[in-house]
Regions:
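N-terminal Rossmann NAD(P)H-binding glycine-rich loop of SDR-like oxidoreductase domains
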Residues: 4-24
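NAD(P)H-binding glycine-rich loop region in Rossmannoid oxidoreductase-like domains
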Residues: 52-93
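A conserved pocket-lining segment of Rossmann-fold NAD(P)-dependent short-chain dehydrogenase/reductase
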Residues: 83-84, 163-164, 170, 185-207, ...
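Active-site Tyr-X1-5-Lys
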Residues: 136-164, 190
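Glycine/proline-rich active-site loop of Rossmann-fold NAD(P)-dependent oxidoreductases
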Residues: 146, 171-183, 193, 209-210, ...
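C-terminal "lid/loop" region of Rossmann-like NAD(P)-dependent oxidoreductases
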Residues: 199, 228-229, 240-243, 251-270
Length: 300
């Protein structure tokens, strides 16, 4: 891979993937939302080209891109948190933008399109998540991600380019959004507040953003056409244990309130990735321990 296009590159995975691609000598074209405050956090590097286009303007973006690109990674998505997940008109637009991203990949000469799906495509499941796990999403976000993955695969096949879809579990790391459990807990502890949680009995799989970026890079090089890969660490433990690790790394001895917040009506209680296909197909091997990942965020 020599020339890479990334939409929605300012989150934790996008940042880490940009850094990975640049370290491998790739030229990166990052398509960002116009006037995004997070653009300034992207690395300053001669190999990185920042292009400001809304997801609704991907047709225009091809005018600013070379015609000999290799892979397009599509992370761009609107309405990802809270009640916005059930903003159905916006979620439908996200599906359209995913198809637009496939067309952009084809127009720019890419041989491969890689989309970022979500564990939300599955709904509530007890057991490890694999590509073969039945998907019954229970919110508009998950429904749209599932539809986008399936429809973009058909569109890519029509255009003659490779299609790979990922279903991402819980990724954490530098530049993650402030409202995630990891980042909000760190911020509250640093501010001297007492963070509140559910009982934390959920069994959870966290993957560090740097490991996720390596997985995406390997998929760009070796991923199989038409496959769905579940992206996680393949290891899981109770959420309360992760919370205590964050506390011990940020502010040892600080008070945390477990069991104060009730579980949501559709609370996912078990989240663990089956990464056998990732290991077999591309040699993925996540190495960052959760404790070390938290240290990296704090140092950040």
């Amino acid at each position: 891979m020599r020339k890479i296009i990334i939409t929605g590159p300012t989150g934790a995975i996008g940042h880490a993937l940009i850094e990975k691609c640049l370290s491998e000598g790739c030229e990166v074209f990052a398509i960002c939302r116009p006037n995004s405050a997070r653009i300034k956090s992207l690395p300053k590097n001669a190999g990185l080209h920042v292009l400001e286009y809304d997801l609704s303007e991907l047709e225009k973006a091809k005018e600013a891109l070379p015609s000999d690109c290799d892979v397009l990674y599509h992370f761009g998505w609107a309405a990802t948190f809270g009640d916005a997940r059930n903003d159905m008109p916006t979620q439908i637009k996200n599906i359209e933008y995913t198809i637009d991203a496939v067309h952009l990949a084809h127009a720019c000469g890419c041989s491969t399109f890689i989309g970022a799906g979500s564990q939300a495509e599955y709904g509530r499941v007890e057991g490890k998540l694999s590509a073969d796990t039945p998907a019954f999403p229970d919110n508009g976000y998950g429904m749209a991600k599932l539809c986008a993955g399936q429809m973009s695969r058909v569109e890519a096949q029509k255009l003659g380019i490779k299609h790979i879809w990922t279903r991402i579990l819980s990724v954490y790391g530098p530049y993650d959004g402030p409202y995630t459990m990891v980042m909000s807990t760190i911020a509250k502890l640093q501010a001297g507040d007492v963070p509140q949680f559910t009982k934390g009995e959920q069994i959870w799989d966290f993957l560090y953003s740097g490991d996720a970026a390596r997985a995406f890079f390997l998929l760009g090089e070796k991923g199989f056409d038409g496959k769905v890969y579940v992206l996680g660490s393949g290891k899981a433990r109770p959420l309360a244990e992760y919370i205590k690790i964050i506390r011990d790394e940020v502010m040892p001895g600080a008070k945390i309130d477990l069991g104060v917040i009730p579980y949501a009506p559709n609370q996912v209680m078990y989240l663990k990735a089956d990464i056998d296909e990732l290991v077999k197909d591309v040699g993925f091997d996540p190495y960052m321990k959760f404790e070390d990942g938290i240290k990296a965020i704090i140092k950040g």
